[in-house]
Amino acid sequence: MLWELYAFVFAASVVFNFVGIVANLFIIVIISKTWVKSHKISSSDKILFSLAITRFLTLGLFLLNTVYIATNTGRSVYFSTFFLLCWKFLDSNSLWLVTFLNCLYCVKITHFQHPVFLLLKRTVSMKTTSLLLACLLISAFTTLLYFVLTQISRFPEHIIGRNDTLFDVSDGILTLAASLILSSLLQFLLNVTFASLLIHSLRRHVQKMQRNRSSFWNPQTEAHVGAMRLMICFLVLYIPYSIAALLYFPSYMRKNLRAQAACMIITAAYPPGHSILLIITHHKLKAKAKKICCFYKLRDFVSN
């Protein structure tokens, strides 16, 4: 039974990772070609391009680690630490980029008059590069905190100092743990807030357009409905992912193999699922994907 569960989780993780790698590589290629041709790139595409690169590296690293685990009975402690830190940094960066992308969508589409919202509206598009760098720095800082926390937790509860006095490190551990949890909690609250505001604003706009039936379905309304669907599907994927990622690491969860397997599958399904959502709701990416699908269908039809 355990072997069957392990094989199922392993196969599902490999499939999800492979799909995610292909989807993000597709985003990278299409946006980079458009960037080279036009010599300019929009703020949303710049964030999307950075997110695709980060996820491509994350999923590639995760796939390599999965293959390594399957083909090696013993694991190096240094390799495990290196993999965990790289994954922590890339995963944190991708989540902050998603938060940034949701923020950009929210301030561009919605029309709220709150001072904080108006400040975001003025600064987000103008300082995209600086905010992308901020995402990197925050991710590096939280990864460093995580590394320090894991190193401190290896020491005894009380450590003897140079002057032969005892000092308790539990306060430091709690502080670092609180910093990491608050960072994840901040991401979660921001993403849910931006997505909820966007869904609320778009729903009001669509209802308003429905009352004016003569101009109900136009390209702008279609784009708004697509953005609303994207945010709803994003929340459906993101909320279970956040819960599963939070529950995966505690020691008591490691004793429940079924719960741990469910958490692993949910966390593996989120990155490729969200990447596919971004493709099908992005006009250029969706058009290019349709062309590729039509090409392969035509080729199969001719070959048959």
UniProtKB/Swiss-Prot annotation:
UniProt entry keywords in alphabetical sequence: Cell membrane, Cell projection, Cilium, G-protein coupled receptor, Glycoprotein, Membrane, Receptor, Sensory transduction, Taste, Transducer, Transmembrane, Transmembrane helix
Alphabetized CDD domains for the sequence: 7tm_TAS2R4
GO cellular component: ciliary membrane; membrane
UniProt cross-references to InterPro entries, sorted A to Z: TAS2R (IPR007960), TAS2R4 (IPR030055)
Membrane topology: Multi-pass membrane protein
Database matches in SUPFAM superfamilies: Family A G protein-coupled receptor-like
Stretches assigned to the Extracellular side: 1-10, 68-80, 150-171, 251-260
TM annotation in the entry: 11-31, 47-67, 81-101, 129-149, 172-192, 230-250, 261-281
Record: glycosylation sites: N163
Segments on the Cytoplasmic face: 32-46, 102-128, 193-229, 282-304
One Gene Ontology MF term: bitter taste receptor activity
Tissue/organ expression: Expressed in tongue, stomach and duodenum.
Localisation: Membrane; Cell projection, Cilium membrane
Pfam hit, one: TAS2R
BP terms from Gene Ontology: detection of chemical stimulus involved in sensory perception of bitter taste; respiratory gaseous exchange by respiratory system
Domain of life assignment: Eukaryota
Additional information: Several bitter taste receptors are expressed in a single taste receptor cell.
PANTHER family given in the database record: TASTE RECEPTOR TYPE 2 (PTHR11394), TASTE RECEPTOR TYPE 2 MEMBER 4 (PTHR11394:SF55)
Family the UniProt entry places it in: Belongs to the G-protein coupled receptor T2R family.
Function according to Swiss-Prot or TrEMBL: Gustducin-coupled receptor implicated in the perception of bitter compounds in the oral cavity and the gastrointestinal tract. Signals through PLCB2 and the calcium-regulated cation channel TRPM5. In airway epithelial cells, binding of denatonium increases the intracellular calcium ion concentration and stimulates ciliary beat frequency.
Protein name: Taste receptor type 2 member 4
Organism (species): Rattus norvegicus (Rat)
